[in-house]
């Protein structure tokens, strides 16, 4: 259900980018979509141990796939920021992509046994 809703949101987002002059706003990302992601991030965060290290992409196959999806969303966010410097972009598009990448990060951690199976970064000086 959650992923199906996000997929629908991404179609809204794509339409928003294609039609920045959409007057009636039917094909726009709206603040409620960003807020929903934030609420889900907060709920997932309550189930996870706090981090004291960076998390490397990996762990379970599902988690690794979610990490890859997160990097793709980050790239889309950077491209949207660049586009916004040249033309009109709904600021909620950029906010949504930012929150979605955090959402995918939390999902990746949950898919690694609630964060217990996270692959943590070991700094070079301590390897």
Q: Could you describe each region identified by the protein language model?
A:
Residues 1-127:
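Phosphate/pyrophosphate-binding loop motifs in nucleotide- or prenyl diphosphate-using proteins
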């Amino acid at each position: 259900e959650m992923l199906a809703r996000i997929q629908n949101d991404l179609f809204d987002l794509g339409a928003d980018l294609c039609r920045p002059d959409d007057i009636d706003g039917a094909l726009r990302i709206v603040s409620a979509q960003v807020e929903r992601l934030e609420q889900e991030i907060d709920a997932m965060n309550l189930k996870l141990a706090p981090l004291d290290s960076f998390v490397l992409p990996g762990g379970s196959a599902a988690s690794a796939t979610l990490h890859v999806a997160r990097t793709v969303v980050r790239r889309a966010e950077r491209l949207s920021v660049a586009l916004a410097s040249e033309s009109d972009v709904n600021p909620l598009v950029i906010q949504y992509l930012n929150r979605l990448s955090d959402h995918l990060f939390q999902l990746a951690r949950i898919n690694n046994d609630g964060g217990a199976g996270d692959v943590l970064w070991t700094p070079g000086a301590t390897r």
